Amino acid sequence: MKIFDEICKDEEILNRYLEVEKYEEKNKGWAYHNFAHVNNVAQMVEKLLRNLNYDEQLIENAKIAAILHDTGANLGKEDHAYRSYLFAKEYLERKQYPIENKEEILEAIKIHSHNFNTNSILALTIILSDKLDVKSNRISEEGRKVVGNRQYQYVKDIEVKIENENLIIQFLMDDQFDLVELEEYYFTKKIFHAITAFSQKVNLKPELFINQKKWISSVNFIEN
């Protein structure tokens, strides 16, 4: 069994994310940072890196970073990346898993909320995959009341593929969404930043669409 699979089945990790769920339910978080979310991130990380022909060790390490990256959200979103780093560092040391380049995993966890300037492909893939997990089922009832954030409740799916040196991202939306409000929201700008940083690192041209139509504002943001 791979280390990633062992971690996913570890009761300590599963219980940790139950703590995250309980905290977010009690404190009315806007989006879930639960096990379902980190598993979504791990799947997207694997898809992207495999399509770019990265080696199995890097893919495994990126998935480990993905599954541990929100373990610090049990005390809220603020500073959760650093708390997740501290938890992951202690956890991996205690488990004594034979992991190569463990520091790169830990660094990716520590910077996943904000650092778009890193040169680490592992970290950039985590950051992008994390930011793209904004589908409707991740948005809480409280989050559906918040201006800007509420627009993500209309995201039915996000399709990502790499084709002919292009990174193609298709947002499939319900018709009720407000494009202006979506574009002005701070987190949408973070999504654009993540797409830009990742694309530049792997020499891909990003192309974003909403319901099969080119997302014009995203093009202007990314090109500038």
Language model segments and positions:
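Non-transmembrane, amphipathic alpha-helical segments
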Residues: 30-33, 117, 183
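Divalent metal-dependent catalytic cores for phosphoryl transfer on phosphate-bearing substrates
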Residues: 50-162
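Charged/polar, solvent-exposed surface patches and flexible loops
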Residues: 6, 19-22, 90, 107, ...
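Acidic/His-rich, divalent-metal-binding segments that scaffold phosphate/diphosphate chemistry
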Residues: 1-80
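Terminal helices and disordered tails flanking the catalytic cores of nucleotide-processing hydrolases
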Residues: 133-224
